[in-house]
């Protein structure tokens, strides 16, 4: 069995221009990630159930390369974001929304949909979305899911 070197992991870091897609390839996109961009983990019910790490980006750093007709969407009850899924394979690829606490309009991409990024290379920050506690900002340790910190 071949050993995996750190060089391989380092060459698949989450920075620069990256392409992403759903499982079947019907949805494709491109993003620009600044060096040092951290992934976000949220404890809201949707993020908890999808176990997603995302990158929060300004809308101009995201380009959808396929037609919107390939997508289905879901809007959460508090209407701060719209989540987009592939109509064919069901993978949630990205979301769009507006939240003043994260800088206004944003696109949130599913980091696991990036085609050439090693998921273990992503350093995460944590948000308390379950308690609508955006004003506290992110932190380096996970927020509790069932109790408020």
Cite the ranges covered by each PLM segment.
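A short Gly-Trp-Pro
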Residues: 1-21, 26-149
């Amino acid at each position: 069995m071949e050993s995996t070197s750190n060089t391989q992991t380092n060459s698949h870091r989450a920075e620069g221009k990256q392409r992403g897609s759903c499982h079947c390839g019907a949805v494709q996109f491109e993003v620009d990630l600044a060096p040092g961009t951290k992934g976000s983990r949220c404890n809201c019910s949707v993020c908890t159930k999808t176990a997603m790490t995302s990158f929060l980006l300004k809308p101009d750093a995201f380009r959808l390369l396929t037609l919107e007709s390939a997508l289905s969407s879901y809007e959460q009850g508090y209407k701060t974001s719209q989540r987009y899924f592939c109509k064919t394979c069901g993978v949630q690829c990205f979301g769009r929304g507006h939240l003043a606490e994260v800088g206004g309009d944003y696109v949130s991409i599913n980091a696991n949909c990036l085609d050439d990024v090693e998921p273990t290379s992503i350093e995460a920050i944590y948000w308390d979305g379950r308690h609508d506690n955006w004003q506290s900002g992110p932190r380096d340790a996970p927020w509790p899911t069932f109790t408020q910190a």
